[in-house]
Amino acid sequence: MGIKEDNWIRKMAIEEGMIEPFADNQVKVHPETGEKLISYGLSSYGYDLRISREFKVFTNIYNSLVDPKCFTEDALISIVDDVCIIPPNSFALARSVEYFRIPRNVLTVCIGKSTYARCGLIVNVTPFEPEWEGYVTIEISNTTPLPAKIYANEGIAQVLFFEGDSACDVSYADRQGKYQKQQGITVPFV
C-alpha cells in the first residue's frame, strides 16, 4: 500500500470526480482580494481540503453528559458565517467544501494543518474508507483557555491517499455504512 502523488490525485479528481470542486494547486492568496489564506488544494502527496461556512458549536446548556450513543442536536448551536469562534476547551463540527468519492482500492488518512495545530486547535477526521463518498464532517477541538477563530473557505486538513495492492472484498458502500453520501454536518449516531 503506497501513498499517492499529485499526478494521480489530479487524474482521479478530473477524470473520476474523486474531489469536487478540485483546486489543481496550492491556493495561498485569495484570487480577488489578495488576502493571505490558510492554504488549500493539491500538494505533492495529498490534498488540503477546505472548511465550509457551516458550523455546529458545542454547548453544555441542555446537557450534563456527552454520550455518543445518545447525542442530540440540542448539544450544538448552528452557525453559518465566514468565521467560527470556538469557546475555550470546547469543540465545533463542520463540513468540507469538497465532496469526495473514494475508489474501491483506496483508503485516506486526514491530518489537521499545522497552522491550526500550532495555535492549539486539533482537527480530527476518521479515514475515508474504500467507496465512501460525501462531504467530510470535521471535528475541531480548541485545547486552549481562550476563544479560537476558524476561517471558512480556507484550508483545515490534508488528505493523504493510500492505494492498496488490490481492491478490498467489502467496501464501505457494500456494507451500507451509516455516513455514506452525507450532505451536511452529520452528528454521531448508533
Curated annotation (Swiss-Prot):
**Short name of one Pfam family for this protein?**
DCD
Assembly, in brief, is: Homotrimer.
One GO MF annotation is: dCTP deaminase activity
Q: Name one GO biological process term.
A: dUMP biosynthetic process
Query: So what EC number does this one have?
Result: 3.5.4.13
Q: Where is the active site?
A: E139 (proton donor/acceptor)
Q: Which InterPro entries match?
A: dCTP_deaminase, dUTPase-like_sf, dUTPase_trimeric
* Record-listed dCTP binding positions: K113, S114, T115, Y116, A117, R118, Q158, Y172, K181, Q182
The coding gene here is: dcd
Name of this protein: dCTP deaminase
Functional summary from the UniProt entry: Catalyzes the deamination of dCTP to dUTP.
Sorted alphabetically, which keywords does the UniProt record give?
Hydrolase, Nucleotide metabolism, Nucleotide-binding
* SUPFAM superfamilies in the record: dUTPase-like
Q: Which family does it belong to?
A: Belongs to the dCTP deaminase family.
Its source organism is Chlamydia muridarum (strain MoPn / Nigg)
Known pathway: Pyrimidine metabolism; dUMP biosynthesis; dUMP from dCTP (dUTP route): step 1/2
Q: Which reaction does it catalyse?
A: dCTP + H2O + H(+) = dUTP + NH4(+)
